[in-house]
Amino acid sequence: MLKLYYKFNFATEPKLTYPNNHTNHSNHDNSNFNNEALKFQLLEELPQSIQNYLSNFEVTEIEIIKTVLLKAKTSFNNTIDSYYLLEDMEIEILHVLKRFKAILIQKNETVEAMQGYLMKSLKSEFAEMHTLNKRRDHLPITSLFNQ
């Protein structure tokens, strides 16, 4: 319902005015659209579940997390004789990111301040996954039906 207001000017007749409740939503909408476009561009080559989770972070946080993630993967792959893709470690990465977010909340820290912690956590998780894969590769193949 539109409310009308009267402004009285004693020198002349009353003037009919409309309240100016209009806020400029176009700038806000445009900013959100730009952020979503930047997020899409940053996340597009990551596995889908990681994209979905990281899309909840701010653009600057995503830039830091993605950089740390790719450095951790490269560093880890350089130290072993195998090569893992992000898709090979998708579940492990997602678990690390969820724990990382919980630590950020508990310690009331920024992504930038905790990027060293994220790097160590990712490399540790990758090493554990690699160790489990190597153990699995060396286990004898047995079947419950052959006993």
Where are these regions (language model features)?
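Charged low-complexity intrinsically disordered patches
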Residues: 1-71
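Generic structural signal for hydrophobic core residues of well-folded globular domains
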Residues: 57, 72-73, 121-126
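Generic hydrophobic, helix-prone segments enriched in Leu/Val/Ile
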Residues: 66-76, 93, 114
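Boundary/linker elements of alpha-helical solenoid repeat scaffolds
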Residues: 75-84
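Short, cationic/aromatic linear interface patches
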Residues: 84-147
